[in-house]
Regions:
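N-terminal secretory signal peptides
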Residues: 1-2
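Conserved PLP-enzyme active-site core in the AAT-like
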Residues: 9-10, 14, 31-77, 104-115, ...
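Conserved C-terminal alpha-helix-loop-beta "cap" of PLP-dependent enzymes
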Residues: 54, 332-418
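Generic N-terminal amphipathic, Lys/Arg-enriched alpha-helix
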Residues: 62-72, 83-89, 351-353
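Metallocofactor- and cofactor-centric catalytic cores in central/energy metabolism, strongly enriched
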Residues: 72, 76-77, 83-84, 91-94, ...
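Flexible, glycine/charged-enriched surface loops at secondary-structure junctions
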Residues: 96-101, 115-116, 288-292, 311-320, ...
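Central antiparallel beta-sheet cores of small beta-barrel/beta-sandwich binding domains
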Residues: 430-525, 533, 537-549
């Protein structure tokens, strides 16, 4: 799956996005089994998810990851070499600038880049590189961020296709974002205020695109404007394809394909830029002091890169395929179920994926419902799902599966899909009322309240209208069945998207319930019908231009 598609799914609730009580996500706390009582070594984490799991000791149920390197479910499992390096680093003290210099030199030797740096995650690396391009390593400028008054570099150019939720890291520096869509617009946008160009390494950054890295580099290099490529979810290429293709700096997530520390990022590229980026990073005071990276993560990330150069990548791929083969053979015995394996060749999210397909009318369950069943009940399994035109599917991503997971996953999917189910009702329950009109909603967030408005048009069971928040008005759609109302709106801004899913109950002129906002969790709402009517007014159309202003 392309990272762009993955980003679109971030606003959805984890797994399949259904509306379920949060209490169902947690295991019962085991008061007789604490971290200190057991000793950390007393807990086991394996593909079998035994009862003696460290998460269960605090009432949290672990997950088998067949979804990918999503941070919200843990990203990746660190390599054994990484854990050993982090453990060793924790036992002694070191001067951090000296450590950064040593790591920078070693990363250069390993990757062929001019220099290397470890940040507290990929986004932090993006933030520090942006600061470096704005300040040029001048601490007088650094301590004034995000107030860029008087700075000569204050703008970052981003192709429209590369705008995404992660470019908050760039915006945090206080720069002005300039969007472009064509090479001509890019050429026109570059000026003495341009600090850098940011490109996200998905399909729009490939050679056949108008704003590919190669094309951007041709335009940017005569102006000596640095290019930053965000390759967060990619496999590490040595020599690096992005640096060879014209990028000045490339950033990776440490906790994705490279299987380094979850809270680390890998930054490779021009030494002068990376030295300024390190200056902008913790432990140095300024806008990056809050992005602390410890000696443990720094050496753990270096160990992950060293391990990457020695790993048996073809052997890992073969193992992943064997796991998918086991699952496919098990579920293919169910009548109406077909399977296929997708082996991606692109650099991002590169691991085999098993697609399991069936007709909704035959098994009377959708892929999203299967994903919800697997994701919310023990043993929990995170998978992808989609339904279109009566066909539905689930997909199993192998990159972070662990030995033994394949057997549990095969049995779980088989048990769910092989159940006999009655056909789904095709008719919706009749609505209990007509709720067309304006509704004034009080939204209760975790620590504040907000006034919203819902303008509803009802056509039988179907609803459309507008949702007015504090800053924007967006389209809204949904249903009413009996007195149960479900609505959805999406607040879209360049680089951002927030999904509001309202689930409420109608009682007279009041709708109350919960709002599900995906990664932003939940809120409560109470909406009351606004029966106020505007006074009637006859409109006089002028016969010409105004005679006074």
């Amino acid at each position: 799956m392309k990272r762009r598609s993955i980003i679109k799914s971030l606003t959805m609730i984890p797994f399949a996005g259904a509306l379920v009580p949060f209490k169902s996500l947690f295991a019962a706390p085991r008061h007789d089994s604490t971290l200190l009582q057991n000793g950390i070594d007393g807990f086991v984490g394996t593909g079998g998810l035994p009862e003696s799991n460290i998460f269960q000791s605090i009432g949290v149920e672990p997950i088998i990851n067949c979804r990918g390197t999503f941070t919200i479910i843990g990203g990746s499992v660190e390599r054994p070499e990484v854990r050993k390096a982090m453990e060793a680093a924790s036992k002694d003290f070191v001067q951090y600038d000296e450590l950064a210099d040593g790591i920078g030199k070693r990363l250069a030797e390993l990757t062929g880049a001019e220099w290397g740096m470890v940040s507290s995650g990929c986004a932090a690396g993006m933030k520090h590189v942006t600061a470096a391009c704005v300040t040029g390593g001048n601490p007088e400028k650094l301590i004034r961020i995000p107030d860029l008054s008087g700075f000569d570099k204050t703008e970052v150019v981003i192709p429209k296709s590369s705008r995404n939720v992660y470019d908050h890291a760039i915006r945090n520096i206080g720069v002005k974002i300039i969007e472009v869509s064509t090479p001509e617009e890019l050429e026109k946008a570059l000026n003495p205020r341009t600090a850098m160009i940011y490109i996200m390494a998905f399909d729009e950054a490939q050679p056949n695109q108008p704003l590919s890295l190669a094309n951007v580099a041709k335009i940017a290099q005569p102006h000596k404007i640095p290019i930053l490529v965000d390759a967060a979810a990619e496999v590490l290429t040595i020599p690096n394809v992005h640096l060879q293709g014209g990028a000045d700096v490339v950033v990776y997530s440490g906790g994705k394909a490279i299987c380094g520390p979850q809270c680390a990022g890998l930054v490779l590229g021009k030494k002068d830029i990376l030295m300024s980026a390190w200056q902008a990073s913790s432990p140095h005071h300024g806008p990056g002091r809050d992005n602390k990276v410890g000696r443990e993560e720094m050496l753990g990330m270096l160990a992950a890169v060293e391990a990457w150069t020695k790993r048996d990548h073809p052997g890992e791929w073969k193992t992943w395929l064997s796991w998918l083969d086991h699952i496919a053979k098990k579920v293919s015995t169910i009548e109406g179920v077909t399977t296929s394996v997708f082996e991606p060749t692109e650099l991002s999210n590169r691991s085999p994926v098993l697609n399991i397909n069936w007709d909704v009318a035959q098994l009377n369950i959708t892929g999203e419902e299967v994903a919800e069943e697997l994701g919310r009940n023990k043993p929990r399994v995170a998978i992808g799902a989609q339904t279109k035109d009566g066909k539905t599917s689930i997909n199993i991503t192998t990159g972070q599966m662990q030995p033994g997971n394949d057997k549990i996953v095969a049995n779980r999917i088989y048990d769910v899909l092989s159940q006999k189910r009655n056909p789904k009702p095709t008719e919706l329950d009749a609505p209990s009322a007509n709720i067309s009109g304006r509704w004034d909603a009080d939204i209760e967030f975790f620590s504040s309240t907000s006034k919203h408005a819902l303008v509803i048009e009802q056509d039988g069971n179907w609803i459309q209208g507008l949702h007015k928040g504090e800053f924007t008005v967006r389209d809204m759609r949904g249903t009413i069945e009996g007195n149960i109302i479900k609505l959805r709106s999406v607040d879209r801004l360049p680089g951002d998207s927030i999904s509001f899913i309202f689930s409420g109950t109608l009682a007279g002129d009041t709708i109350s319930g919960s709002i599900y906002m995906g990664e932003y969790r939940t809120a409560k709402f109470v909406a009351k019908r606004n029966n106020n009517k505007l006074p009637r007014e006859k409109i006089v159309v002028p016969g010409g231009p105004p005679l006074a202003t």
